[in-house]
Every structure is written in structure tokens, then in C-alpha cells.
């Protein structure tokens, strides 16, 4: 799903950027730490960059089982530079491993940064970055499954995405564009999912000081229109609550097959107003997307919790995970770390032989589509504009009034969160009664 930008509504487009020259297999690049990397075959090309298979330099050619990829673009282009800053600050292997260890995770779906540098070829300078290699993206799998994921799979995916968001948020960044095409399966383990494309990752809290809430008409509707946050619709810089709101829309689409505003994506104001209306009436959103009786109560509780967040408030990530875990219990399941991409009907798995084939294809896929890992020229210019905006004074947001700093909100808001926890317990009890009836 392509981004829908305000540039399409009359703003001038960015200046054209140079295309990357294609390198031959076997070319050796030397990163800033003097480590050498050998290129394999190209596996993707976008508007101005290329992606190649890569491995540490040796006398052997880089094979199809290469563990890494290298992203290359002309050094005077912007996207890779922006993405590189995120990886250097937040995605070094030792940082990720420390987080996994201290938070007792099996893995963390943030690609690891292995190195970067500049490379001269034919009198031209190129910037490159080495990162992990991945398999298929979730958008392809979603479409192959008639645009449905099972309820268990949606909840499993979302738990892992919450792990990712907590990590990048704690490292002062927000993603701003969570969607299926930016979620890639591990090349070797189809039960692991990774969030990619940090070309527009926004440093919302540099040096511990949160950006202030400020609406900028020039920035309205930034992002992928059907998923972007209400803040983004109003031209406000990305924040933690925006990432969580976007994840909520993804969950609803993955489970129901659509979002209520998808019928008129040509009108950004219609999309914005629809989201505001449904944010204020989550029950109506659930009724619209899930007209059947078996509604996913955990998603409603998640959306209710997220809408209480202030612009600068630190989310209670474990509370959100607990909501989704209660949803798994309600359907008689648990967080087993398995992603089942079988065909589904009405949120339930419908087994068919082809599902094993698709899972194998997802596991063996060597395609890292450059469109899923790089941003467009328009995104680059607009990201630069966002970073240049000076935040002056707080403005009340429709989601709630911003608070100062990067801390959590006051005790009254905590009481609202406690109320949600009580709702979660009621949801769990209803799930238990449902299972007992089924056993009888």
C-alpha cells in the first residue's frame, strides 16, 4: 500500500535524485571499521537505491544463502542517510542482544546493523549499509490468504510488534509507518517477524526532551493514509501514541479484511474525520468491522487504552500486551510464538493443504523488495521538512492534552488504565465460560 502524501494535494514534489549505478557481483566494499564485504547478486532496485546479497569477504563468491544484504545509493541522496542514523543509534547487535537478555525475549524484530561506509566507483561516491537479510513481507502473505489472518495470528504478530515498538521508543525513535509491507519474516525462521523501513524514523525525544505538540498544516495526512494516526492527519510530528494507534488499525484490517474509511482514500479529510469519529466511539468501530457476534473484545480494549494516551505520555506496554494475552486466552490459545498463515474464515483457521506450501515459500523466500525497505523521493523531502520544524508551545490535541517531558501521566489517568485492566479480567472470565460451554 503506497503512502498517500500531502504533496499529492498540490505541494511541489522533491528534486529528482540520482540513481545508483549497479555493481557487479564480487565487488568488495570496506566499511568504517575496515571490515570488507563482498557483494552478491542484486535482489532489489528502487527509485534511487539497490539491494544486494552480501557476506564477509573471502575467496568464495557470495551464494544464494548469504546471511546479509547491502543497501547502496548515491551519497548525496537522503533516505539511506536517515535510516543509517537510526541503525547507528539504536540497532547495533550488542544493543539488541542486551535488550533481549534483560527483557527475557526469545528475539526482537529489529534488523541488526552490521556496518556502513562510503565507496567510490567511476568517480562517484556511494553510501552503503550492511544489515540482516529477510524473507517475504506480510502484505504478500495477507493477500495470498484472501486478505485475512486468524485471530491468533493477529494477536501473536501484535505482541511481537509491541516488543519492537517499546524498544525503538525507549531509544528515542518512533517508526510512523507500521503496516504489513514493512513487516518481513526472518529468512530462516518464518515464526519471526521484523519491522523494517526506518527511512522516516523520527527522533521524537532527543536527549530526553519530548517534542511539543504542534499542528502544521503543511504536514497534514503524512504517512500511509489508511493507517496513519490522527495526529499525523493534523500535521503533528510522530509520537509513541501514534505508533500504537497505527498498530490498532493494522490489527483490525488483518482480522476483518478492511477498514471503514478504505472506500474513500482519495479524500484525506474524510479518512481523518472517520478515524476521529470511530476513536470517540470504539464500539461503533467494532460493530462496523465485525458485524458478527464473535467480536474481538481485546482489540476494542486495546483501542480504548491507546486513545487515553497523551501526546507525550509513555505508554504502559505491558498493560497493552496483557490485553492481547487475555484475547488469546479468550479463544483458548496462548502466546506460543507460532505464526500460522493458513487460510481463515471469519477469523478462524480454515485448514487446507496449500497452507503448508505457502509457509514453505515464505520461509525460503529470498526476496527483499526494495520498495518495502526504502522510502520514496517524496518521503525524503517531507521527512526533512518535519525535522526542520521548530516546536513552539503546546496545542491541545483531539486525542488528549499534551503533557510536558517524557514521563507518564497523572493518577487520574492511571485510574482509567486500572478500569481497563478490570475489563480485561471480565473478558478473561467470559472466555473461560465460553470454553466450558464448548467442553460440555
UniProtKB/Swiss-Prot annotation:
Keyword presence, Kinase: yes
Phosphoserine PTM sites in chain numbering: 342, 376
Cross-link (Glycyl lysine isopeptide (Lys-Gly) (interchain with G-Cter in SUMO2)), chain numbering: 71
Start and end residues of each Protein kinase domain: 37-317
InterPro entries: CK1_Ser-Thr_kinase (IPR050235), Kinase-like_dom_sf (IPR011009), Prot_kinase_dom (IPR000719), Protein_kinase_ATP_BS (IPR017441), Ser/Thr_kinase_AS (IPR008271)
GO molecular function terms listed in the Swiss-Prot or TrEMBL record: ATP binding; histone binding; histone H2AX kinase activity; histone H3S10 kinase activity; histone H3T3 kinase activity; nucleosomal DNA binding; protein kinase binding; protein serine kinase activity
EC number: 2.7.11.1
Composition skew (Polar residues), residue ranges: 379-391, 398-410
Reactions it catalyzes: L-seryl-[protein] + ATP = O-phospho-L-seryl-[protein] + ADP + H(+); L-threonyl-[protein] + ATP = O-phospho-L-threonyl-[protein] + ADP + H(+)
Region (Disordered) location: 379-440
Catalytic class of the enzyme: transferase
Processing after translation: Autophosphorylated at various serine and threonine residues. Autophosphorylation does not impair its ability to phosphorylate p53/TP53. Phosphorylation by PLK3 leads to induction of Golgi fragmentation during mitosis.
Tissue-level expression: Highly expressed in testis. Expressed in liver, kidney and muscle. Weakly expressed in thymus, bone marrow and spleen.
Domain of life of the source: Eukaryota
Physiological role: Serine/threonine kinase involved in the regulation of key cellular processes including the cell cycle, nuclear condensation, transcription regulation, and DNA damage response. Controls chromatin organization and remodeling by mediating phosphorylation of histone H3 on 'Thr-4' and histone H2AX (H2aXT4ph). It also phosphorylates KAT5 in response to DNA damage, promoting KAT5 association with chromatin and histone acetyltransferase activity. Is involved in the regulation of cell cycle progression of neural progenitors, and is required for proper cortical neuronal migration.
Homology family: Belongs to the protein kinase superfamily. CK1 Ser/Thr protein kinase family. VRK subfamily.
Record protein name field: Serine/threonine-protein kinase VRK1
Organism: Mus musculus (Mouse)
